[in-house]
């Protein structure tokens, strides 16, 4: 019973503290365009405070964004493609 109560309390907290992946957008609602992953790594980590980032389909895709950051709405197929980084 105690385990169940602990599970019910911890589960919502884990969802709140989780981080998300996606194309981080600026104040104009556009994701940074790119050709090189090094540019995206710097853009994601220094501008958007993500854990890392790389160039996916000519836009910077960031990993580990805070929940309050806005991301570009994309299709599930594109998201699953970009969630698997080719270059580390």
From Swiss-Prot:
This is Beta-insect excitatory toxin 2. The keyword Membrane does not apply. One of its GO terms (molecular function) is toxin activity. Has the structural arrangement of an alpha-helix connected to antiparallel beta-sheets by disulfide bonds (CS-alpha/beta). GO terms for biological process: defense response. Its main location: secreted. PROSITE patterns: LCN_CSAB. Residues 20-83 form the LCN-type CS-alpha/beta domain. Residues 1-18 form the signal peptide. Expressed by the venom gland. It is found in: Secreted. It comes from Androctonus australis. The keyword Disulfide bond applies. GO terms for cellular component: extracellular region.
């Amino acid at each position: 019973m105690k385990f169940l109560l602990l599970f019910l309390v911890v589960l919502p907290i884990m969802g709140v503290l989780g981080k998300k992946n996606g194309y981080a957008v600026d104040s104009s609602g556009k994701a940074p365009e790119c050709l090189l992953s090094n540019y995206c790594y710097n853009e994601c980590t220094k501008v958007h405070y993500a854990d890392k980032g790389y160039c996916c389909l000519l836009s910077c895709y960031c990993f580990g964004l805070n929940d309050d950051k806005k991301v570009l709405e994309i299709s599930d197929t594109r998201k699953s493609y970009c969630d698997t980084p080719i270059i580390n």
